[in-house]
Swiss-Prot record:
Keywords: Flavoprotein, FMN, Monooxygenase, Oxidoreductase. This is Alkanesulfonate monooxygenase. Pfam families: Bac_luciferase (PF00296). It is an enzyme of class 1 (oxidoreductase). Its EC number is 1.14.14.5. Catalyzes the desulfonation of aliphatic sulfonates. The lineage of its organism: Bacteria, Pseudomonadati, Pseudomonadota, Gammaproteobacteria, Enterobacterales. It comes from Yersinia pseudotuberculosis serotype O:1b (strain IP 31758).
Amino acid sequence: MSINVFWFLPTHGDGHYLGSSEGARAVDYSYLQQIAQAADRLGFGGVLIPTGRSCEDSWLVAASLIPVTQRLKFLVALRPGIISPTLAARQAATLDRLSNGRALFNLVTGGDPEELAAEGLHLNHTERYEASAEFTHVWRKVLEGETVDFAGKHIQVKGAKLLFPPVQHPRPPLYFGGSSAAAQDLAAEQVELYLTWGETPEQVKEKVEEVRAKAAAKGRTVRFGIRLHVIVRETTEEAWRAANRLIANLDDKTIADAQQAFARFDSVGQQRMAALHGGKKDNLEISPNLWAGVGLVRGGAGTALVGDGPTVAQRIQEYADLGIDTFVFSGYPHLEEAYRVSELLFPHLDLATTELPTQRPATQPQGEVVANIYVPQKVSQS
């Protein structure tokens, strides 16, 4: 089975070491452009752009990088409860048209109540997934060309519609990750690709089977992806030295402070990530070549595949055998590691080819929209 491999744009910072300013570098537009162009040139299918208060805005970053890339797809965040589904659908269609079908969307419910409250969202975990399900229903239908009336518990819209469709038909694919039962129910019912963070193959197998069964019960099929860091070198010994070097400047206080901050999250996925290492620097190889060191201070994806090219490819195949077809990778620093992954890992993988859709016109040739409602129809010639 061919696999899709994405890279990552580190809009929240980058460097040679975790939890330290030593070896850090400025993440400005020029640097992000270098990473995006490298990923585009090296054969990555797309890039994940993170979201949250610690990051640059993912939509603006993606839009700014469209003109300087050719085939690279951009996986950007949808934030239910923070933006209306109708506006989000219009923005999604615009990004898809401007990029000629290179837009992908990642539904992010959020897991930090403190950050969400700062955004004006004061729902608990259960309520957030209710709101996310309603948001996604409206967003999908509007993008697919329907006029939507919807009266839910959290979302109410009347006459929601889109005048200019996206390039991808019927709409751009929707990605989503979440480990709770509510998240898996949402994935089974509404998304195209379910993402998991890099847990052990046994844990991932359990998740895949649960979501697959729930989707089948609704008459649907769902694709699967995984989010991992990668530390690949010419030898496995060298890769492990690089992994240990990445956390060489971490002290116990920095780790404890990070874990205390993560403890306030109500994200089941974050809780599962934290359980892999227990906040300790020893015994970080939790499965063959799967290292939990990144999660000592980084929220979200906290594990890395470590080894030489053939070894890492073998571990990737183990996940692929479970049904994973999309791998979203990253590495520190992200520019250099994109090249290492391309040179040392790609030759051992069966990579899918990126296909772009036929472009639709961004606006109709018949003229300007009338009264902000009607697209003029072409008059037939007799």
